[in-house]
Amino acid sequence: MRSREVDTRAVSRGDYEAFLADLEHTMREYDGTGIAAPQVFTPLRVFLYEVNPETRKRNEKSVPLTALFNATYEPVGPEMEEDSEGCLSVPFLWGGVVPRYQTIRVRALDRAGRSLAFEASGYHARVLQHEIDHLDGLVYLDRMPDMKSLAYTVKFG
């Protein structure tokens, strides 16, 4: 599901706070790192995410729960890394190996409607690319060069 941009004035007024609370509840209920509005059948360019190295076993800086509206990104250099990803939208799959840009520049609005521009690297950049893909109607499977690394959460047969 492709999403449409969110009105900056509506973000500034706090019109989406109840929706963000629902998104957070869903993300936590399913132990997600992030969740985008299209994943709950709402075609808006908004997502929540957090990077918690303690639970994700990554050598990364923490990023507190963050809401981004109308987010876009561009790569900072051609360097890419491959790593495993999974997704709440594809619950029957454990995940697969996905190449992502190592460093990206993000432009978005925060939950107060202020413009943001920042760089992210490593796992933080991977999470952002994954969530922004949802806003563009993509899932991680669309980014996989081959499906050989896919792992299922249940056995069939």
Where are the model-predicted features located?
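Positively charged
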Residues: 1-157
